[in-house]
Amino acid sequence: VNIKELLTDVFVVIVPEQNVEGYEHMTRTTGQGYDPNRDEANQTLFEDANAMALVNKFNPMVFTEIHGRVDAVLIEPCTPPHEPNYEYDLIAEQFIKLGEAVGVGAIANNPDHNSFEMPFRDFLRGNEDSPTGKEWTQPWDDMTTAYGSQYPVLIGTAGITWELPVYSDISAEYMVPYGLMTQAMFIRDNKISMLENQAKLFSRGVNNTNSNADVAPWYVNQYDEAGAQAELMRPVYDGEG
């Protein structure tokens, strides 16, 4: 990969550390006891307000939050239930392909881990007692925009979190550069379709388009029945109340 050529198609904005106080004191929270990764929607903290200001400025195709920690390598997209205000049909395919691209890069030449988990792909399990024979058994959902990678999805950005494996500095050193490189390659190869889908999202908003028929299949229940929670998640306003 010629990095200089790659950067003619992709530019990267890096925030090396969002929670400086937590970094200094080795805590998840800030010095005041707040968790920045639960405040992206409300933005009561300057750290979150400043990070989301960058999103508003650049309208990125992808927003990546890199942190930890879990037992293995985990790359989103998330399981259901999805945030009701997402136009999920426009980003679902991109989400899955992006996660695969990042995951393949993250484990390349990695001496500690040769596989990765993707909640949207891996957390739907067989269950002979369920009405469909399957079930979402482990919650790793994007129901709230409080998380750093979920808030930008409201504007059509493919927001994903990478969970770095616990106690594995070597894996982190391999995951981040290789994962970012294959992520950039994915954006380069899919930039037109990603821009088109973001434009479709804006068009739906400007024209007040009811896209429930397109979005509904993605609002499944625990047993992965397509559209089972669509009316609950995205009720059509009837003018009452």
Predicted segment positions?
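Metallocarboxypeptidase
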Residues: 13, 29-241
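Short helix-loop-beta-strand segments that form the rim/entrance of peptidase-like active sites
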Residues: 1-32
